[in-house]
Amino acid sequence: MREFVYYSRTAPTAGNSIGKDLQEAGRIDIAVHTVIGVFFLSHKIRSDAKLHLLFAGPPDPVKHLEIQPVTEGKTGIDKIYLSKKDVSGILKRMLYKYREGERREVFPGFHIEKKNFLEVVRDLSEKGRNLYVLDPDGEDIRTADIKENPVFILGDHKGLPDKEFKRLKQLCTPITIGKRTYFASQTVSVVNNELDRREDEGRLPRE
């Protein structure tokens, strides 16, 4: 299983903060494109990926939205397919369904809770995941030793907070996808492509 952790300093933490203009809604448009980059192939949704969204914008930070879409069965009351056309609507509904003090499953595979960024990262570390943080000064992903069950951590257009980033370097291996700066959605697509290649070549176990 490959996992991604996306941290946004500005993404809203209440459903009523998300309107039609996604850029004005704390740049949640970046999170939407990141969801698409993590899960969508042509005519297919990945079943080997999980995404952790950490929203630290107003009014009630930090919200942890965990997404691992159901890819089998019928859509309806008890199951939901992830649709590119309505990612923002799904995130909005998840935020509306949050209840204080609960980790709540909004749809099968879609959970929300209040949890800070480093707590999520530490939990993944304690589960034995191999952690990698996107860092311009890190090792090139093409030559890096990517181990089984990797987790890749990245920030929004403002990047990861300096204090948290310093702590992350103690838990994670810094890697880069190149010298140029890419959108978060492009970054996860590049990482996915590298993992796909390694799996296809037998250099990384396939989920």
Spell out what each predicted region is.
Residues 11-14, 59-61, 138-141, 157-160:
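Short acidic, S/G/P-rich loop/turn micro-motifs used as interaction or catalytic elements
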Residues 56-58, 62, 67-69, 136-145, ...:
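Extended interaction regions within the primary functional domain
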Residues 148-151, 172-173:
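Active-site regions of enzymes building and remodeling cell-envelope glycoconjugates
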Residues 2-132:
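RNA substrate-binding interface of SAM-dependent RNA methyltransferases
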Residues 162-207:
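Structured adenosyl-cofactor binding patch, chiefly the S-adenosyl-L-methionine
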Residues 135, 153-156, 177-178:
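Thr-Gly-centered strand-to-loop micro-motif
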Residues 29, 154-159, 181-185:
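Short, amphipathic alpha-helical segments
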Residues 111-149, 159-167:
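Active-site cofactor/cluster-binding pocket
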